[in-house]
């Protein structure tokens, strides 16, 4: 192996603003397969860590792949320090996790990372399920989120169903959802963005609710009828990009929602079942 060693000057190591930890597909536009190009469109550098590697989402007639083994997953994370590639790191985001053991490994890595990066922004999308499908991850993942990742996160982006699972509270109306979100806030967890709060069905609107200790902001967007997957992953990619580019939280959430709508409509115009990113207009 030593005879193959070419790159040992750590001063030349590639650096990134964001480490994005979530699913990856060979075909399609979900997880890091949509998040990475979206983040790069925003002029930010990102390292992608896969939790599962799949041929495509399970919504096709064939489906291959599975969770990344723990040994590989922990090695991917450890390699960043071995390459000295995190000198400029500003944020870590998480999405779909393959196993509860991955969550524990990630939490241990984040805890150690915080010692060198005390201002690190950790944003967790606690992917668990939705109202239509119920829980679609392994049954031990919700508790792993509660035990390991939520205590480390500054912000989380659950949908209504995930908020109910994490808090054990009914969240089917706006007031109860806000109360549930506030119950999660702590000295570390500063904000909760509820990504699918109840909206005005008659006016074809959906609501995103931004909850912090001292404010609640309800942002309404047009509802687009579609079966497209990966919109939540895209939203989170746009949100973290906006925050790192200096946008205030409410503005970053609003802009992220608008971008998702733009991408969905662009994709529909091109008659695709997988998200297609149009060029990013200057903000």
UniProtKB/Swiss-Prot annotation:
SUPFAM superfamilies: Ribokinase-like. GO terms for cellular component: cytosol. The lineage of its organism: Bacteria, Pseudomonadati, Pseudomonadota, Gammaproteobacteria, Enterobacterales. B6-vitamer kinase involved in the salvage pathway of pyridoxal 5'-phosphate (PLP). Catalyzes the phosphorylation of pyridoxine (PN), pyridoxal (PL), and pyridoxamine (PM), forming their respective 5'-phosphorylated esters, i.e. PNP, PLP and PMP. NCBIfam families: PRK08176.1 (NF006034), pyridox_kin (TIGR00687). Its EC number is 2.7.1.35. It catalyses: pyridoxal + ATP = pyridoxal 5'-phosphate + ADP + H(+); pyridoxine + ATP = pyridoxine 5'-phosphate + ADP + H(+); pyridoxamine + ATP = pyridoxamine 5'-phosphate + ADP + H(+). Pathway: Cofactor metabolism; pyridoxal 5'-phosphate salvage; pyridoxal 5'-phosphate from pyridoxal: step 1/1; Cofactor metabolism; pyridoxal 5'-phosphate salvage; pyridoxine 5'-phosphate from pyridoxine: step 1/1; Cofactor metabolism; pyridoxal 5'-phosphate salvage; pyridoxamine 5'-phosphate from pyridoxamine: step 1/1. It comes from Shigella flexneri. Keywords: ATP-binding, Kinase, Magnesium, Metal-binding, Nucleotide-binding, Transferase, Zinc. Mg(2+) binds at residues 136, 162. This is Pyridoxine/pyridoxal/pyridoxamine kinase. Substrate binds at residues 23, 59, 233. GO terms for molecular function: ATP binding; hydroxymethylpyrimidine kinase activity; magnesium ion binding; pyridoxal kinase activity; zinc ion binding. PANTHER family: PYRIDOXAL KINASE (PTHR10534), PYRIDOXINE_PYRIDOXAL_PYRIDOXAMINE KINASE (PTHR10534:SF15). Its cofactor is Mg(2+). It comes from the Bacteria. GO terms for biological process: pyridoxal 5'-phosphate salvage.
């Amino acid at each position: 192996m030593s005879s193959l060693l070419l790159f040992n000057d750590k001063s030349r190591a590639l650096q990134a603003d964001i480490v994005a930890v979530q699913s990856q597909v060979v075909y399609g536009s979900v997880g890091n397969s949509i998040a990475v190009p979206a983040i790069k469109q925003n002029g930010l550098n990102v390292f992608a860590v896969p939790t599962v590697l799949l041929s495509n989402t399970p919504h096709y007639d064939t489906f291959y792949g599975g969770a990344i083994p723990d040994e590989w997953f922990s090695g991917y994370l450890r390699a960043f320090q071995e390459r000295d590639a995190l000198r400029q790191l500003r944020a870590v985001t998480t999405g779909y996790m393959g196993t509860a053991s991955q969550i524990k490994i990630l939490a241990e890595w984040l805890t150690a990372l915080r010692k060198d990066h005390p201002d690190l922004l950790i944003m967790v999308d606690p992917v668990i399920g939705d109202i239509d499908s119920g829980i679609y991850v392994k049954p031990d993942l919700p508790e792993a989120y509660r035990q390991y990742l939520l205590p480390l996160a500054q912000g989380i982006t659950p949908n209504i169903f995930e908020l109910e699972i994490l808090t054990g509270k009914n969240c089917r109306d706006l007031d109860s959802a806000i109360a549930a979100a506030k119950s999660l806030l702590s000295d570390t967890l500063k904000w909760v963005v509820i990504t699918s709060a109840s909206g005005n069905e008659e006016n074809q609107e959906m609501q995103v609710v931004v909850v912090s200790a001292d404010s609640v902001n309800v942002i309404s967007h047009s509802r687009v009828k579609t079966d497209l997957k990966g919109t939540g992953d895209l939203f989170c990619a746009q949100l973290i990009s906006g925050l790192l580019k200096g946008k205030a939280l409410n503005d970053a959430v609003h802009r992220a929602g608008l971008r998702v709508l733009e991408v969905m409509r662009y994709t529909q115009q091109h008659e695709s079942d997988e998200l297609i990113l149009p060029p990013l207009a200057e903000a």
